[in-house]
């Protein structure tokens, strides 16, 4: 094929199922790397020894472990892992090819889901936010199930396609509370609620 028309990268693993993923070349050329070590030592087998593909902004399932082959092409390969296992179901029953880009997301890590607070008063609501398309611009927190939102503080540095820690000061008076967070990234994308996702995707 004409290499000037290349748009996608195929990554294949050496595991028993030959895990294979197609990644947009634009993402693969944006700070991607082939890792052979972690924390000053060789990759451990469970983490993909001897080689693992790392692509910032792309979901971890596309960070192929036990990497044995990379191939460049001008159209997706439609591997079994992309047409049978990893697809997005739509409301009308059809499906679309799995989207591997990490949309802007956030999660509250403390207090964690289902946790019973032992005392009323001050609590630091904290969590992580990230975006596969840019940087975290702001995070908002709701303590009443999404009826009202207030801005959280962001820890620095705030880096491109990286986790960002956030904090929200909350004084709990003992009432029932439903904690939620939502992030807005540098593209203007706002993290949707689960109800909004179900309306769009049907699942």
Where is each model-derived feature located?
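Structured, non-membrane catalytic/scaffold regions adjacent to prosthetic-group chemistry
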Residues: 1-203
